[in-house]
Amino acid sequence: MHSTPLVFSHANSFQASTYSVLFAHLRQRGFAVQAIEKLGHDPHYPVSNNWKHLVQQVADFAKAQADKAGGPVWLAGHSLGGFLSLMAAARHPGLAKGVLLIDAPILGGWRSMALGVIKGAQLVGSLSPAAVSHKRRNTWPSQEAAYEHFKHKRAFSKWDDAVLRDYIAHGTVERDGKRVLAFDREIETNIYNTIPDNLDRLLRRNPLKCPVSFIGGRQSWEMKRVGMGMTEKVTRGRIIMLDGTHLFPMEKPLATAAAIETALRNMGA
């Protein structure tokens, strides 16, 4: 059976292996999923303002997959990964057959301008998740201790257990006899601090040549904060909502896989 090439980009601080359960469901549904394991950690693609180099990292990775497939591929991404996928498709026409934003609402209009002002005043670190990420605990005596720590944190409490165990297994590494977060906290914080304030301008200068869809979580605080006006415009109403928070792909991997298949098939996959 022919598999549909799909390049998936992860959310900030949750490397691709965290989505292993979701990827397995997608592969069962006929998608050949490929992903960069850890965005922001390759010195050839440093974190910079408006994520210029991260966008290029996704574009270069997707182009390699497109060359293997003999044509454009589908791009999907969760949060950070969704924005990078959208920007890569805009900057590189012909790369993507379509883009799927997974709880990655597009910031536009006055909100985008306000973000630019906040970044210019160097206040974004105190207003974004960066305020928490730079001081987050990142060391545990064992893998099981890390599992128990995250299991009882509100943001992780609804996660599918297999997904949480994948996060602990792959998202922490052995160092000096302890388990340490594999995703560097400074890089995570820097990604938040350099969040793009130019998305609407970028899309005006580089009109998308492919369809875009969005899947959101009904309880997503991120979606409510950003608003959906720009997203509705860019997707032309191709929107699916699932019960869950911003991290619904980790909470409901099977339902998320079904929604991803629906969204991509609807766009012609």
What are these regions (language model features)?
Residues 137-218:
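Alpha/beta-hydrolase
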Residues 8-11, 79, 217:
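Glycine-rich His-Gly loop
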Residues 244-257:
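Catalytic histidine-centered segment of alpha/beta-hydrolase-like enzymes
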Residues 2-45:
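Conserved HGGG/HGGXW glycine-rich cap/lid loop of the alpha/beta-hydrolase fold
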Residues 98-139, 224:
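Flexible "cap/lid" loop of the alpha/beta hydrolase fold
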Residues 71-114:
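Conserved hydrolase catalytic core segment
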